[in-house]
Amino acid sequence: MSKYIPFTTEQKERAASVDLEEFLRRRGEKLITSGRDKRLASDHSITIRGCEWFDHATEQGGRAISFVKQFYGLSYPDAMSLLLGDDLGGSYPAAREKEPEPAKPFVLPPQSESMRRVYAYLLQKRCIDREILNAFVRKKLIYESCERSRDGTKEYHNAVFVGFDEHGVPRHGHKRGLYTMGQSYRGNIEGSDPKHSFHYLGGDDTLYVFEAPIDLLSHISLFPEGWQEHNYVACCGTSSIPVLEMLRQLPQLRQVYLCLDNDAAGHAASERMAALLEEHGLNACLLYTSPSPRDTR
């Protein structure tokens, strides 16, 4: 049991304001750049910015003290002592005060001259049904992007999964690398509105929820009968925001199938979404997907 240690108000604020990026680097944690944030290499669902953190799997977050308590499993006194420097003999720097950031405009990347790579990847590597892929392409929900490196010597091709609002305006984009060697890039385009994540609305009373766009396409390929009548959404992660938007747009819903990944983050998100759906008077059926070794996203 940790002994009681009285901390002053100044000490509490100093501990809460510790720069988490520097703190984690000093402790040997690997961080990955993700837009303006950093992600933990050991847990991609957690993002860090300054003294603040957010776990996108559990939709919880806070400042440095709560992070150290949760991530390292420490008591409040032990977390305070660690952040104030008792562990290494010196204090950690405070995070810089955040300046207001202008809203990042949402811009889809330029299209490639052909869809050759995206068709080859989705049909041959991911076994998506051609007719289903054609249907999504015709609706401009999927296309192949082509972006050049800063020095203009390289081209980068990605599959782009587009989310539209109710007026047909693109509001969200998720990019997935098409290279099959090593770890492929995936991520949401900056400025994307999570409410309008990649989705298809058929209009009936059934909704299928997935983490990744390719999971959505794979499910339809496996169960194509009457798919045009159903509703589907890929959260491009584990946030509940796209699901709430579907509830708003589809008041006729009666049944929701949660088809998230069969891992810890998927289980936690499914339970959270099921509780949310219950609050709205809807039944939720859990149908976990099994990620393949080469990454189903």
Please place each PLM-identified region on the residue numbering.
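Acidic, metal-coordinating catalytic cores used for nucleic-acid/nucleotide bond scission
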Residues: 238-240, 260-270
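Terminal peptide-recognition signature
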Residues: 55, 68, 122, 211, ...
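Phosphate-handling DNA/RNA-contact segment within nucleic-acid enzymes
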Residues: 147-249
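Acidic beta-strand-to-loop metal/phosphate-binding motif
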Residues: 209, 254-263
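Conserved active-site segments centered on acidic
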Residues: 81-114
